[in-house]
Each structure stands twice: as structure tokens, then as C-alpha cells.
From Swiss-Prot:
Annotated source species: Porphyromonas gingivalis (strain ATCC BAA-308 / W83)
Record's bilayer topology term: Peripheral membrane protein
Keyword Flavoprotein in record: no
Keyword Membrane part of the UniProt annotation: yes
Protein's name according to its UniProt entry: Protein translocase subunit SecA
Oligomer status and interactors: Monomer and homodimer. Part of the essential Sec protein translocation apparatus which comprises SecA, SecYEG and auxiliary proteins SecDF. Other proteins may also be involved.
Enzyme category, top tier: translocase
Major place of residence: membrane
């Protein structure tokens, strides 16, 4: 088939070739233009785009004027037309962009040529040139002439522009414009490629986002490529240079081209959806994004949702430090036990007796289940025949659905499953844990379902049963938190290692990204795991927080009208990128053939031998005068190799999560003669390693990988550091049987193959079969990780549909354009819910009572009509009356407020711009800020609009915050469904829909209840003096109100919360719901304090029992 139709890469290039041919034709014409005429072409293209969509824009403006004064149904139709026209504008713009692509690409290519070939470019000065000259050294003004230099500072270094786009870069640029992923090898100039589609799409004025993996690159690239865009009158900024929620960041988003990191784009979106004033918003609509290192952002970072969290009153109330000694005791006992088991296993397996050997294999397997990372165990398993013997034992005990596995694990204190990232306490472990307490069931969850069932069968009065039930639930809640704390502490000790998954710096636990080796600033493990690690490391245990807003990067980037990306390594993940983002991967050919030599893996028996061989290879390469880049997978290994090199007297640089400040400088020097650089996987994404002629002659940059990573993509990224633009180079990986990947995923087949080949200590093995086995193990892990990311997305998709509804409604309220329509819809929904709840049961009395609570009106419907009409007719009748009542109350507020507003405006308009109007629902006073002039000119109508906005925003934020907490609890509790042979995701979808429906219904009722009871508070018979006082004090000027974001914090919450099914289910009875741990907003009452109800009992024995 590929011979007949060509392979995918060939078909992709065939599709793009016509565009490249047209660009070359256009370039011939553009080259002949003067510098001023070249800039003039940009203005012509911008106008052409606007002219193409001017009819639709005019129609939208006309519809927005028409919508005022229309009834509810007509308003909805008009706004639907507006939404449709806005989508049509975007689609039409894509058509015109394709038309002008050859000319736009030719303009930016020729601009690059002119900067490369001329020290200065002189053009007629515009206002933008004059503004640029104030803050940028590369532009100066001489009379009416703007002089652009061809050198400027980018990322702290002076750069001389010397780049012109190659043909393959024109291909890459076209692919990016089409909303695809361009895979380009390292050194092929991805940053320059991006200038083509960025320039073209920025001409629309809708904004282009260039997304990078770190703030150094976002700042550097905005400064490096910025002058090319600025020369043509486009504005460029970088969000990472400015504080969140600041005017400077707002301005950065309004620029034609905005650079920034993925996290900050996502967090700004969440902050915008917590804003209480339109002036707090920073982002525009999501138009077009180009994601640099797209695999890192959309795949690696997609496993960790973005979260904005805030303080919670019970945040300090934690048990980690209290139970730490108990857990340390269990961990220490397990270490001693497993060490002894290993010694006994070795003795028995050395015996000639087959039965003794079998017993030894069982002891070895038991030691493995208890402490799989024990270095002595790992070393022993690399000896001939040992691992294959243990794997056979494991197979025997896993047979028949692990019926006999308890014979292996009963002797242990806890069981570790590295593959599933879980730890489970055994009965023996629980006994040791509780040995310090008086209660043998101190750390055991009660069977709540059985206890409640037994209670229901008791023959006692209802009041006693209720009290007993409250006691059972309170006990379960306390014990559940206790068990959860112990489980997390156990995980912190058993599965997380310092200088591997995390580092401790400045008395803080900082997570290290497993893919890049970088510190993940601001990110914390979820579900108490981070606090557990803090307790383990004896640093300050931070307070727990509550989620206020959350989104996955996957769903954030799917909001863009058009999304594209570029990377050196995406082909291996092409399936995932298409499945989740509908992004096609196109492999762009290199400008020059790759001359790098990729050698077979060298496989050693132990890690010690492997590292010794790595050091010898480094010494040999340095003697040849070649630079060496050594890639490691953890901080610990980079430090080990550094110590070994120091012993040999070899100078070197280390780049890891602890030593990352001079990253760009170290990577830039990594190509010099005899330079040795040890780096975790963070090394050099986005930074080129350039070689001198002398180094090229010696053989180029040598890459040494000290371990295969779980992802083939990360290995390809490391190899790709060498061999840029046809340079010579080499790459090789050193692997041992003790490596993490080999230990977890190497099968019995590999172990027995090693034995057959007679693999002895000190020997090196280069074998195609083994290399393929390593690659198969990597594929297994990749599939597993894809499953985790897809699973996370499936859960977040449920959340996303709810988030869209809430955020759309919130945005309408914030902007105010559609607030009137949304309020009327809310009143209608409440009316419909009231009729639906009572009409079917013919409960007219219940309906009347609930109607007074919800809408504060008498029933306009008689009992006869209530029983004789259809539900739809009843809803319409009720809505008509509710609408009239609402309108009367709003008119009355405007009528009462306007005279006072008018007086303040007449006498103090020069002093005050805004005014606060107090409005109450009888329970609470809301101070509504509005523009003084507008309030006077609209006869008080603008006050009503501001009041509606404030109430809708208030009820949405309160309801959504509580809903997020309930959704978190639901997500954890549904995992038990898998033990009942049910699909947890399906249960989650059904339950979450019901939760959301109830939340919206309650939110609607709360909104309407406040609006329908609204009035301006007026004291009875006020004296003239009091009236004057109220006018001056109660109705006073108000400064511009802005949202205070300082009390919220951002974090990238680890996927850990989504992987806790096994441990939760293991410690919770089947069918029992996860305990609710309510986050309360009132002052905290101690459990031993007197109950505030006045009973004289302690709080824990009275109203505190069910908390």
C-alpha cells in the first residue's frame, strides 16, 4: 500500500508542497520591495482580513442594539444568532488566511533576510516605532526615520540576527498554520519556524499565544523573535514578565502576540473565572496557540491538573505528626524482617535440596513483596537463575485469583506494589500500629453498613436510633481520617525517595518532574500525601487547602479555536495526540542528513559495573577531545557520577533539580572541547549545543544515557541533543538489570535469556533481542501512562461539561450583556422545578408553602387549576406572576435609590465616580457598587443590573466551590464499585450528573430567593438628622473594586488522587460510601468545648457528634 500511495510522511509533504511553491513565487516579488513598502504590505494584509468579515461584524453590532426591549424567547434567538456569526467570522478568517499565507510567509522570510544582511534597516517612523524606541535599544528615532539594529538582547545575552528560513522551515510553518504538530529534529530551528504562522495569524488581531515549557524560554523567545514582529507594527509581550492579575499582564494578553508558560496560561483562565469585575479579566477569547515542546506540555504535564486552592478553617487540623512515630516503628520492623528474610532465602537457595530451594524462593518472594527497592535484594536478583526462580514462585501464588497469596504476605507488616504505586497494611502491621494505644481497633475502619443495618433492626425509639446512628457515623469519620493519615505516611516511606521523586530545599519538600528532572514550583501532591512526606522529612507540615477552581491542561488547550505544536519527538505519541486533541503529527524532513551514530545499548548485570563502565567511556571520550553529555534519570544518580568523576580528577558541570540556576549557560558550553556535562532529563530543551570546527573534526558531541527512561520519547530527546544540522556525533545507552525499568517490567523470558547466555559479573552484553525487550518494556509503560492520562481525561470530561455551563453563566453575569436573560431563565427554571415537584403528587398545600419560600409570592394558581391543567401551562402561569412581581420589586428599588443618587451626582459628581447602594433580602445587606453618572442617567436601572450581577456571581461561586468538594469525594468513593464488578466511571457519570442537577437547582433557588426579596433597607420614621447621616454614610462613594487573588494559591495537583482505588477499597467495607469531611466556614469549636446550643454537654457529645 505504501508503495502505491506513499507513506504518511510522503503524503503529508505532498499536501504542503503547493503552498511552499507559492511562497517561493511570492518571495521573488517581495525581495524587490523597499523597506517601507515591505512594511506597507503588512498593513494591506491586515485590512484585507477585516474587510472580509466586516458584514458579519456589522450584523453583530446591529443585533446587540436590537436585543434591548425584546421578550425572553426573542432575546435567546438573537444571542444564538450572535454566537453563530462569531463562529462564522473565525471560519471565514481561516479561508482568507490560507489565501494570504504565501505572501505573509514571504514577508517574514524576507524580513529575516534583511536583518541578517544589514546592520541597520531605516524606515519612515510611525507612532509605534517611537513607542518602541523608548523601551528597546534596537530601535532609535532620527527625525522622521526609525532605525532598526540587527542585534539585541535576548534571555540576558546579546544576539546578532543571522537566520533566514530554509525550505523545510517553510514546510514546518505551513503545518503549524494548519493546526497540526510539526516534528522537527533538534537544531532544525523550531523557534524560527514559529515566526511564520505566528505572524500570519497575528494579522487577524484576535491574538496568538506561543506556549513554552518554562519562563526562561518564554522570556527569551519573546525578546529573540519579537523585533521581527515589531518591525511590522505588531505588538509582542510575555505574561511571565508580569504579576498575575496586574494591568501589565492584562496588556500582555491584549498584544497581537503573547508568549508564556503553559501553567500561567491555564492559571490565568482559572483566575478569570473567579473574577468579580470585568476589569479583573486578563484573557481574551482563545484563538490560536502554538505549543513549543508540545509532547512535554500536552502529554507529560497533562497528568497533573491545574488547581487554584485557598485556605480552609480546618486546614491546620492534621494528624500526620501525631501518628508519625507509629508508622516509623512499623517501617523499621519491616526493614529488619525483610533483611532477615533475604539472608534466610540466600542460605536456602544455595542448598542442593530442591525443597530447601523452593522454601528459599518463597522467602525471597516474601522479601520482595515487603521491600522491593532493597539494594541487597536487587543485587541478588541479578545473579543467574535467581530472578527466574522468584518469578516462577510469584506465578504459582498468583494462580486462581491469588487464592494463596496470603501465605506469602501474612508474615509481613505491609505489602508494597510498585507497579500500582500502592501500599497495604496487613493484620500484623495493624497490630503493631495499635500496640501503643489502648484500643486494638484504633486504626481499623468499622463495618459501617453492617452497624447501620443492625441499628435499623433494633426495637428502640426513633430518637435513640438517630443518636446511635450519629455516633456510628462520627466514629467512622474519625477513624477514616486516622486510617487515611497512616496510609499516606506509609506511602511516603515505602514509595517515595528523597532526591528521586522529590528534594528538600530551604526546609520545603519540592517535587521533581519525572520526565524533565526539573523542580515543579508550586506543585504539591494531593490527598495529604505531600503533608505525609513533609512529616517524614521533619519539615513544617503545611496546612490543608480547599480547591476553588481546577482544570486539566488537556481541557484548557482544547478550548482554542486552533491549536498547533512543535517538538523533536512526537511520532511515538501520535496516536494519543490524535485521540485526545485531534492533532495530526507531521514529520518534517531535516535540512541536512543526520550524521549522528546511534549505537546499541550496552547491558550490564549490576548498576555498579554499569557506572564504572560509564566513567571509563567518559575518560576515553575526553582524551579524544570530544564534549560529553551524560543523561541521568534522577538527582541521586547525577550526584553519584559527579563524585566518581571527581575521584578521577575530571572537570565537569552538573545540571539537576538542585543546581538549575545556570541551565542555559551550562548547556550552551556543553559543546566545547573536552567538556563533560552531567544532566537529568531537563537538559537543554530549547537551548542549542553548538560545536566548534575542532570538536566536529574530533567526532562531535557524545551522548551517554545512564539508564533507559520509561518513555522512548525522552530517550529520543536525549539522543537528539547531538547531530544538529548534519553535525557528527554519537549516542549510546548503558543499562543494568538493576535499573528501575528492567526491575519492574523485565519478564521471566529476559531473566532466563540472560542465564542461557551465561552472563557473568563484569561482562557487557550488546544483543538485539535484549534491546528489543527493553523497547517492549518501554512500550508497556507508555501504554500504561496513556491509560492513566486517558482515565484522568474521562473523569475531567464529566467535570468539563459542568464547568462549561457554570463558567458560561458566570461570564454572562460578569460582562452583564446577557444578565437579564439569564435571570429570567433562572426564575423560569425555579417555577418549573416547583411545578414538577408538587403537580404529579397533587400536593397543592406543599406547593403553596414552598412557593412562598422560593419566590416570596402568593400562589396565582387555585387548587382547581393546579389539579386540572398540564405542568407546562402551570409553569407558564406561575412564571408570568413571578416575573411581574420581580419587575415590580426591581422598579421599586430603582425608584427609591434614584433621588438619593441624583442628589449625590448633582452635588458631588466632581469628587466621587462610584456609589455604594445597600440592598437587603431581609437576612443580609449587599453593598452594590455602581457608576454614579450611569446610575443617575438610567434612573437607577443600572443599579438593578449591578445587583443582579453581584447576586448571580455570589451564588455561583459559593455553590461551585461546594460542588467541587463533593465531586472530589464522589471520585474517591466510586472506586469501590470495581470490587462489585461495576464500572467506577459509569457510576461517577450518573452520580455526578445528579449532584450537578441538585447543585444547579439549589443555586437557582438561592439566587431567586434573594432577588425576589430585595429591597433598600429604610429605618422606620427616620429623623431629618438620621436621613442626612444615611445619605452621607450609608450611601457613600466607592473606589473601584478589584478581586483580591492574594489568598489563593496555584498548584499542579498530582495524579495521585486518581490512583488511590486499591488502597481506599482495601481499608473500607464494600458498599460503604467515602466519609464526608465537610469544609466549614464558621469559627472552629474544639471537640471538648461546651456545645454552643446551651445544653451544658461537651460539643463532641452533643451537636459535634456527626461532624
Amino acid at each position: 500500500m505504501s508503495k502505491l500511495f506513499g507513506n504518511k510522511s510522503q503524503r503529508d509533504l505532498k499536501e504542503v508542497k503547493p503552498f511552499v511553491d507559492k511562497i517561493k513565487v511570492a518571495y521573488g516579488e517581495i525581495e524587490r520591495l523597499s523597506d517601507d513598502d515591505l512594511r506597507g504590505r503588512t498593513a494591506i494584509l491586515r485590512q484585507k482580513i477585516q474587510d472580509y468579515v466586516k458584514d458579519e461584524r456589522a450584523e453583530i453590532d446591529k443585533l446587540k442594539v436590537e436585543v434591548e426591549g425584546k421578550d425572553l424567547d426573542e432575546r435567546e434567538e438573537i444571542w444564538a444568532q450572535v454566537d453563530k456569526l462569531e463562529k462564522e467570522i473565525l471560519d471565514k478568517m481561516e479561508v482568507v488566511l490560507d489565501e494570504i499565507l504565501p505572501e505573509a510567509f514571504a514577508i517574514i522570510k524576507d524580513t529575516a533576510r534583511r536583518f541578517a544582511q544589514n546592520e541597520t534597516i531605516r524606515v519612515k517612523a510611525t507612532d509605534l516605532d517611537r513607542d518602541l524606541a523608548i523601551n528597546h535599544d534596537f530601535v532609535s528615532i532620527e527625525g522622521d526615520t526609525a532605525v532598526y539594529q540587527n542585534h539585541w538582547v535576548a534571555g540576558g545575552n546579546e544576539i546578532l540576527w543571522d537566520m533566514i528560513h530554509y525550505d523545510v522551515q517553510l514546510i514546518g510553518g505551513t503545518v503549524l498554520h494548519k493546526g497540526k504538530i510539526a516534528e522537527m529534529a533538534t537544531g532544525e530551528g523550531k523557534t524560527l519556524v514559529a515566526t511564520l504562522p505566528v505572524f500570519l495569524n497575528a494579522l487577524t488581531g484576535n491574538g496568538v499565544h506561543v506556549v513554552t515549557v518554562n519562563d526562561y524560554l518564554s522570556k527569551r523567545d519573546s525578546e529573540w523573535m519579537g523585533p521581527l514582529y515589531m518591525f511590522h507594527g505588531l505588538t509582542v509581550d510575555c505574561i511571565d514578565k508580569h504579576q498575575p492579575n496586574s494591568d501589565a499582564r492584562r496588556k500582555a494578553y491584549n498584544a497581537d502576540i503573547t508568549f508564556g508558560t503553559n501553567n500561567e496560561f491555564g492559571f490565568d483562565y482559572l483566575r478569570d473565572n473567579m473574577a468579580t469585575s470585568p476589569k479583573d479579566l486578563v484573557q481574551r477569547k482563545h484563538n490560536y496557540a502554538i505549543v513549543d515542546e508540545v509532547d512535554s506540555v500536552l502529554i507529560d504535564d497533562a497528568r497533573t491538573p491545574l488547581i487554584i486552592s485557598g485556605p480552609t478553617p480546618k486546614g491546620e487540623d492534621q494528624l500526620f505528626e501525631e501518628f508519625l512515630p507509629n508508622v516509623e516503628k512499623v517501617v523499621e520492623a519491616q526493614r529488619k524482617l525483610c533483611s532477615q528474610l533475604l539472608i534466610d532465602a540466600k542460605n536456602k537457595m544455595a542448598s542442593e535440596d530442591k525443597k530447601e530451594q523452593e522454601e528459599g524462593s518463597l522467602l525471597l518472594f516474601r522479601s520482595f513483596k515487603g521491600l522491593p527497592k532493597n539494594k541487597q535484594l536487587i543485587k541478588y536478583l541479578s545473579e543467574p537463575g535467581i530472578k527466574s526462580s522468584m518469578l516462577k514462585t510469584e506465578e504459582a501464588y498468583m494462580a486462581e485469583n491469588m487464592r494463596n497469596m496470603h501465605l506469602v504476605t501474612d508474615e509481613l507488616y505491609f505489602i508494597i506494589d510498585e507497579k500500582r504505586n500502592s501500599v497495604e497494611l496487613t493484620e500484623k502491621g495493624i497490630d503493631l500500629l495499635t500496640s501503643r494505644t489502648d484500643d486494638p481497633k484504633f486504626f481499623v475502619l468499622p463495618d459501617i453498613a453492617a452497624e447501620l443495618s443492625a441499628l435499623d433492626n433494633m426495637e428502640s425509639d426513633a430518637e435513640k436510633r438517630r443518636e446511635a446512628k450519629d455516633e456510628i457515623i462520627a466514629n467512622y469519620s474519625i477513624k477514616s481520617e486516622r486510617v487515611h493519615t497512616v496510609n499516606q505516611l506509609l506511602k511516603a516511606y515505602a514509595l517515595f525517595e528523597k532526591d528521586d521523586q522529590y528534594v528538600v530545599m530551604d526546609n520545603k519538600v519540592l517535587i521533581v518532574d519525572e520526565q524533565t528532572g526539573r523542580i515543579m514550583d508550586g506543585r504539591r501532591y494531593s490527598d495529604g500525601l505531600h503533608q505525609a512526606i513533609e512529616a517524614k522529612e521533619h519539615v513544617k507540615v503545611e496546612a490543608a487547602t480547599q480547591t476553588f477552581a481546577t482544570i486539566t491542561l488537556q481541557n484548557y488547550f482544547r478550548m482554542y479555536h486552533k491549536l498547533a505544536g512543535m517538538t523533536g519527538t512526537a511520532e511515538t505519541e501520535a496516536g494519543e495526540l490524535w485521540d485526545i486533541y485531534k492533532l495530526d503529527v507531521v514529520v518534517i524532513p531535516t535540512n541536512k542528513p543526520i550524521a549522528r551514530k546511534d549505537m546499541n545499548d550496552r547491558i550490564y548485570k549490576t548498576a555498579r559495573e554499569k557506572y564504572a563502565a560509564v566513567i571509563e567511556e567518559i575518560v576515553r571520550l575526553v582524551e579524544e577531545g570530544r564534549p560529553v553529555l551524560v543523561g541521568t534519570t534522577s538527582v541521586e544518580i547525577s550526584e553519584l557520577l559527579s563524585r566518581m568523576l571527581r575521584l578521577r580528577g575530571i572537570q565537569h558541570n552538573v545540571l539537576n533539580a538542585k543546581l538549575h540556576q545556570k541551565e542555559a549557560e551550562i548547556v550552551a558550553q556543553a559543546g566545547q572541547k573536552g567538556t563533560v556535562t552531567i544532566a537529568t532529563n531537563m537538559a537543554g530543551r530549547g537551548t542549542d549545543i553548538k560545536l566548534s570546527a575542532e570538536v566536529k573534526k574530533a567526532g562531535g558531541l557524545a551522548i551517554i544515557g545512564t539508564e533507559r527512561h520509561e518513555s522512548r520519547r525522552v530517550d529520543r530527546q536525549l539522543r537528539g541533543r547531538s547531530g544538529r544540522q548534519g553535525d557528527p556525533g554519537s549516542s549510546i545507552f548503558y543499562v543494568s538489570l538493576e535499573d528501575h525499568l528492567m526491575r519492574l517490567f523485565a519478564t521471566e523470558k529476559i531473566a532466563s535469556l540472560m542465564d542461557r547466555l551465561g552472563f557473568k559479573e563484569g561482562e557487557v552484553l550488546e544483543n538485539n533481542m535484549l534491546s528489543k525487550s527493553v523497547e517492549r518494556a518501554q512500550k508497556k509503560v507508555e501504554e500504561n501512562n496513556f491509560g492513566i492520562r486517558k482515565h484522568l481525561l474521562e473523569y475531567d470530561d464529566v467535570m468539563n461539561s459542568q464547568r462549561e455551563v457554570i463558567y458560561t453563566r458566570r461570564r454572562h453575569a460578569l460582562m452583564g450583556e446577557r444578565i437579564g436573560m439569564d435571570v429570567l431563565n433562572t426564575i423560569y427554571d425555579v417555577c418549573k422545578a416547583l411545578i414538577d415537584n408538587y403537580a404529579e403528587a397533587n400536593d397543592f398545600e406543599g406547593f403553596k408553602e414552598d412557593l412562598m419560600r422560593a419566590l416570596a409570592i402568593e400562589s396565582p394558581i387555585t387548587q382547581e387549576i393546579f389539579r386540572g391543567k398540564k405542568a407546562e401551562e402551570l409553569t407558564d402561569m406561575l412564571f408570568d406572576e413571578a416575573y411581574k412581581s420581580f419587575q415590580r420589586k426591581m422598579d421599586l428599588i430603582a425608584e427609591v435609590a434614584h433621588p438619593v443618587v441624583h442628589q449625590v451626582f448633582e452635588t458631588q459628581a466632581a469628587v466621587y465616580e462610584r456609589i455604594l447602594i445597600p440592598i437587603t433580602d431581609g437576612k443580609r445587606v449587599y453593598n452594590i457598587g455602581c457608576n454614579l453618572r450611569e446610575a443617575d442617567e438610567t434612573q437607577g436601572k443600572s443599579i438593578i443590573k449591578e445587583f443582579e450581577k453581584a447576586i448571580v456571581l455570589h451564588t455561583i461561586d459559593e455553590s461551585w466551590k461546594e460542588h467541587l468538594r463533593e465531586m472530589d469525594e464522589l471520585r474517591n468513593s466510586v472506586q469501590n464499585a470495581s470490587y462489585e464488578n461495576k464500572d467506577p466511571l459509569l457510576i461517577y457519570k450518573l452520580e455526578s450528573y445528579e449532584l450537578f442537577r441538585k447543585m444547579v437547582e439549589a443555586m437557582n433557588r438561592k439566587t431567586v430567593a434573594i432577588l425576589m426579596r430585595a429591597r433598600i433597607p429604610v429605618p422606620e420614621a427616620p429623623s431629618q438628622e438620621e436621613l442626612e447621616h444615611r445619605r452621607q454614610i450609608e450611601i457613600r462613594h466607592a473606589a473601584e473594586q478589584r478581586t483580591d487573588m492574594s489568598k489563593y494559591r496555584t498548584q499542579k495537583d498530582d495524579i495521585e488522587a486518581q490512583q488511590k482505588a486499591q488502597r481506599d477499597a482495601a481499608s473500607r467495607p464494600q458498599g460503604a460510601a467515602a466519609p464526608q469531611t465537610p469544609i466549614r466556614n464558621e469559627n472552629k469549636i474544639g471537640r471538648n468545648d461546651p456545645c454552643p446550643c446551651g445544653s451544658g454537654k461537651k460539643f463532641k457529645q452533643c451537636h459535634g457528634r456527626n461532624l
